[in-house]
Structure formats: C-alpha cells, structure tokens
Amino acid sequence: MQRGLVRRYFTMCCSIILTSIILLGVIFMVFAAQYFKEDKLGALEKNAKYAAEMTERYIISVDGRYQLVNNALLTSSWIPMAKALDADIYLANLSGDVLLCTHRSTCNHMVYGIEEEMIQKVKNNGCYTEVGKMGEIYKSSYYTAGVPLTLSDGQIAGVIFASSSAQGLTEFMGDILKMLSLIHI
C-alpha cells in the first residue's frame, strides 16, 4: 500500500514538473517570436527611413512631376544597408509600381508591384509593417517595413520598403519545438 502511494505521488510530481517545463517552453516561444518580430521590423523600418532620407537627395521636380536622377548611384548607396540586413530595399511610386530595387536576382517586386492597400497604409499611418508575403511578391514569409518618401515640400513622392526573410525565426522556433519534444519523451 505504501509503495503504491509513493508511486502515485512520484508520478504526480513528475507530471507537474513536465507540464511546467512545457508551459514555460511555450511561453518562451511566444516571447521569443514577439521579440524577433519587433527587433527585425524595427531594424527594417529604421533602415527604410534612412534609405528614404538618402533618396530625397536624388529626386528633382520637373514641370510639377518628380523624377529620380542617377538611379545607379542611388541603388549602389542602398546596397550596403540591404546586405547588412540581408534584406531587399525597394522604391515604389504611389501607384504601386516598383522603380528601384536592390534585389540580386529576378525582381518579383517589379513583376507584381505593390498593392494599393499597402501604399495607402503608409500614406495614412506613416509606416507599414507586416510579416507575410507582401501580396504575391514572396513565396514564404518576410518581415516588411514601408515608410513614405516625403520631400522637402511635404509631398509624398513614393514609398520605400525593406523586406527580409523570416526563415531565421522559423528555424529558431523549430529548434525550440525539437527541444520541447525531447523533454516530453
């Protein structure tokens, strides 16, 4: 009788400890995912703002219309930021057409363009952030931040977006799940 009672208490204590570890693991995953997201989106937004400041120097007004001058020099000034973040930086006009991009291979940004809804969110809120596929542009999840390209006269001439793959978060979460499943076994 005493053996059965000890065994029952031991089993109950083990299950409480195991449940606590799993619960703490899940809470850790939620906080880690939120931290990853906020950190990455913050860095992308900061660099998109910096790219917008740089871009403003390359825009002139001709007969009331804005034009980019020296696209190659502008793009080459964006590339160090893009490489440091492992991101794509691209400029879209207010119609959603992508005018410039740092993407290193075939550019889906120019093929699909930016959805009007995203452009409107930037114009209305001063910023746009998402973890998603940017409409049809990306095949997997990307962190994306967009900021308005506001000229010295206060006009919004376009939107600068910075996007980076969310694959690192996916791998991290997978590793955490593996660790939790090992604890469970």
Language model features with spans:
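Helix-start (N-cap) segments at beta->loop->alpha junctions
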Residues: T150-D153, F161-L180
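Amphipathic alpha-helical bundle/coiled-coil segments
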Residues: A82, I89, Y143-G146, S163
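Glycine-rich acetyl-CoA-binding "A-motif" of GNAT/NAT acetyltransferases
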Residues: I156
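Extracytoplasmic/periplasmic sensor domains and loops in membrane signaling proteins
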Residues: S76, H103-S140
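A short beta-strand signature within small-molecule sensing/ligand-binding domains used
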Residues: Y138-T150
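Conserved small/polar residues in nucleotide/adenosyl-binding loops
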Residues: I183-I185
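Acidic surface patches and DE-rich sequence motifs
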Residues: N93, E136, L151
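Juxtamembrane segments flanking the first transmembrane helix
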Residues: Q2-L99, H103-T106
